[in-house]
From Swiss-Prot:
GO terms for cellular component: photosystem II; plasma membrane-derived thylakoid membrane. The gene is psbX. It is a single-pass membrane protein. It is found in: Cellular thylakoid membrane. This is Photosystem II reaction center X protein. The lineage of its organism: Bacteria, Bacillati, Cyanobacteriota, Cyanophyceae, Synechococcales.
Length: 61
């Protein structure tokens, strides 16, 4: 751990750069959730509900 902290100090990273990187990472997570996870979840719920309705309607025949 000591070597990593020395490397960061020696590389002269600023707090602003670290902050911008963290904000970008969080923004990427949010974008991924909005673009991939939410539509996939909605689609799977839709298919699951439709399949459930199909099974109950065929069971009544």
């Amino acid at each position: 751990m000591f070597q990593i902290s020395n490397l960061l100090i020696a590389a002269d990273f600023s707090a602003e750069v670290a902050n911008n990187s963290a904000v970008g990472m969080i923004g990427s997570f949010i974008a991924a959730a909005l673009l991939i996870v939410v539509p996939a979840t909605a689609f799977l719920i839709f298919v699951s509900q439709k399949d459930s309705l199909d099974r109950t309607s065929t069971g009544r025949r």
